[in-house]
UniProtKB/Swiss-Prot annotation:
Organism superkingdom: Bacteria
Name recorded for this polypeptide: UPF0342 protein Lreu_1268
Organism in which the protein naturally occurs: Limosilactobacillus reuteri (strain DSM 20016) (Lactobacillus reuteri)
Pfam families according to UniProt: Com_YlbF (PF06133)
SUPFAM superfamilies: YheA/YmcA-like (SSF158622)
Length: 123
């Protein structure tokens, strides 16, 4: 039997959209977009973070003003309920994805199980 793993991945992608976790995230994101001022600030925060990360990846350091701007934007958006709700939904999706990743990669973990270091208390 020939298995096309990419067909399976595409089906998993489709099913992901049907999960409670994804639908909750989608609803939270729509609520954020509906709050125009908060959404604009959120986009500025995301862009400022991306710019700083890009600088770091190219060997540059963000300026003190850029860091202060990111901190101020983070403080402003993190206090908003719609952003807190979005972050809670992101955590739920992340938890689900971690479990999926654990399941998907279990054959690799099994393959290397003989050489994986044991943590204290494991048998």
């Amino acid at each position: 039997m020939v298995v096309n793993i990419y067909d399976t991945a595409n089906e998993l992608s489709r099913q992901l959209r049907e999960t409670q976790e994804y639908q909750g995230l989608q609803k939270a994101f729509e609520a954020l977009k509906a709050d125009g001022d908060t959404f604009d600030t959120f986009k500025k925060f995301q862009q400022a973070q991306a710019d700083a990360q890009h600088k770091q990846m190219t060997g540059q350091q963000p300026t003190d003003d850029e860091i202060k701007n990111i901190q101020n934007l983070a403080k402003e958006v993190s206090g908003k309920k719609v952003v807190q709700d979005l972050m809670n939904q992101e955590r739920q999706v992340d938890s689900m994805l971690q479990q999926l990743n654990k399941t998907i990669t279990s054959p690799i973990q099994d393959l290397y199980s003989e050489v994986m270091p044991k943590m204290p208390g494991q048998e």
